[in-house]
């Protein structure tokens, strides 16, 4: 007797290949970039978090001066501190020009969803490695989703969202000390955002399980 088994196809995309978590883990950024054979990363931030990007730049420069002669020094290609909410494509285009002229070989985003979104937009367009250093609880660094805003003639803005495994950052460094200086209001809103992401993921997992197992499998 021949039986027919209907299987529900699905796709699964893994989270970032590498996650580093703990207090003081930001100090591991130079080693992570060296592991990726990066020597000229472009640092991304919002205007409000320029000081944090400058601190990263100092960290990388000091690590290069203390590295052995056999190691390739890491010299940041520069800082692009124009990241803003909803990832406007006009900002992305300006950042792309900086990537090209500076010959950056990676992007490092430090901040929340706005900066990480810009890093995603650059990485998916260029294929460059993207290392995230989150400073909020938004969770954008753990999703392969990119939301962008384009402005058409007449000032009309259009929000576009897409999903692609190439959008997912390759390395995420969670230094819990970076969240300690967040204002209480921002901590609360980004925390709620993280809970919302977790709830959506839980619902998605349950729906995936139901789609896989709702059809009985007949023995051959």
What function would you assign to each model-found segment?
Residues 24-26, 113-115, 141:
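Gly/Ser/Thr-rich beta-alpha loop segments that engage phosphate groups in nucleotides
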Residues 29, 51, 117-118, 182:
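Glycine/Thr-rich phosphate-binding loops of Rossmann-like dinucleotide-binding domains
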Residues 98-122, 126-137:
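A short, small-residue-rich loop immediately preceding and capping a beta-strand
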Residues 53-55, 118-120, 141-143:
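Short glycine-/acidic-enriched loop or helix-start segments at secondary-structure transitions
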Residues 2-105:
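ATP/NTP phosphate-donor binding region
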Residues 17, 27, 124-219:
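A glycine/threonine-rich phosphate-anchoring loop and its flanking beta-alpha core
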């Amino acid at each position: 007797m021949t039986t027919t088994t209907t299987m529900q196809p699905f796709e699964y995309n893994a989270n970032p290949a590498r996650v580093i978590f703990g207090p003081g883990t930001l100090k591991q950024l130079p080693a992570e970039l060296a592991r990726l054979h990066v020597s000229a990363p472009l640092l991304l931030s919002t205007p409000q978090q320029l000081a944090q990007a400058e601190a990263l730049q100092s960290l990388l420069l000091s690590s290069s001066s203390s590295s052995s002669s056999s190691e390739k020094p890491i010299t940041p290609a520069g800082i692009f501190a124009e990241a803003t909410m909803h990832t406007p494509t006009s900002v992305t285009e300006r950042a792309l020009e900086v990537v090209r002229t500076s010959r950056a070989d990676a992007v490092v985003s430090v901040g929340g969803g706005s900066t990480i979104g810009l890093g995603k937009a650059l990485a998916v367009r260029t294929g460059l490695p993207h290392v995230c250093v989150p400073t909020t609880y938004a969770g954008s660094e753990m999703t392969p989703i990119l939301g962008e805003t384009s402005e058409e003639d007449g000032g009309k803005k259009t929000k576009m969202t897409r999903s692609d495994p190439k959008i997912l950052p390759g390395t995420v460094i969670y230094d819990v000390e970076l969240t300690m200086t967040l204002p209480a209001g921002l901590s609360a809103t980004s925390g709620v955002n993280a809970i919302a992401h977790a709830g959506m993921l839980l619902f998605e997992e349950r729906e995936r399980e139901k789609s896989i197992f709702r059809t009985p499998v007949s023995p051959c």
